[in-house]
Amino acid sequence: MYNNGDFHIHSTYSDGSLMPSQIINLAKKWDMDIISITDHNNTDGIDEAIIEGKKNNVAVIPGVELSTRYKDCRVHVWGYFKEDIYKNELLKEVLLKVKKQRIKDIRRGFEDKIDFCGFKNKLCVQTGVVILR
């Protein structure tokens, strides 16, 4: 069983100031035994965190913070992954398009499968949840 953790941490792969390995070392120093890296719209730092976590006995739950919209408000949706689902190439491609604000490209690939809630250039919360499922 885990005793102390943080499930919303950003690394230098988004707007954080520490590399994933530095985050693990700091978590260990602060007696955390479980964390999740949830960078904005990418999963690039997770492998580094998992490797460093194993060295330091800190469990790492792979995660991401997806940028979406609800009406006129920005809403971040957190997704947490079992095993290595975060390495899925389609997911990585979609996250890259969200990061580069190329929602039109996502619409072309998924328009018949996902409801985009009337947005043309943004992801609604509902779409974000479907993508992370």
Language-model regions: role of each:
Residues 1-73:
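An N-terminally biased module of ancient metal coordination in phosphate/nucleic-acid-related enzymes
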